[in-house]
Amino acid sequence: MKVYTKTGDTGTTALFGGTRVPKHHIRIESYGTVDELNSHIGLIRDQNISDLYKNVLIEVQDRLFTVGAILATPPEKETLKNGQPRLQNLGIVESDIEFLENEIDIMEEALPPMTHFVLPGGHTTVSYCHIARCVCRRAERLAVHLNDMEPTDELVIKYLNRLSDYLFVLARKLSHDLNADEVKWIPRK
């Protein structure tokens, strides 16, 4: 299979099921941002961090491919002509969200309680986590916007919301593990 098809040379692309839409369509923005997020998470995984975190991030990347597939499938193409779901055995389930919540809880047990907002930074790896968190929030906003236009799996939105929480806590935990300065934001008076 060739990487290039030339079918997108006029500014359109195909969704799952074959429907062609402009490349600026909210559905493309939505799953394209999830793809961008996945790349940022790969960058975090490539850092010198514990294999425990790397394994969680591999699971997250797998789930993000599923999220992308869901977002790339318009509602009218979710079911094949034979009545079977187009994305059979693919989906986000409550246990995916619970997995993130459990990982958040484990990390938070080892951290001092938050008393202030924290400025992103302190170490390159921590900064990568904050960038991924921001991209995740953008992906979530786009998925919500898409959901306002066409029904979208609500667990996708919930997963992206929880993932941004996970990435924030991971940034704090890595800051702690790396003995990086966690600078509190204290508003000027």
Region spans (language model):
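Phosphate/pyrophosphate-binding loop motifs in nucleotide- or prenyl diphosphate-using proteins
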Residues: 1-189
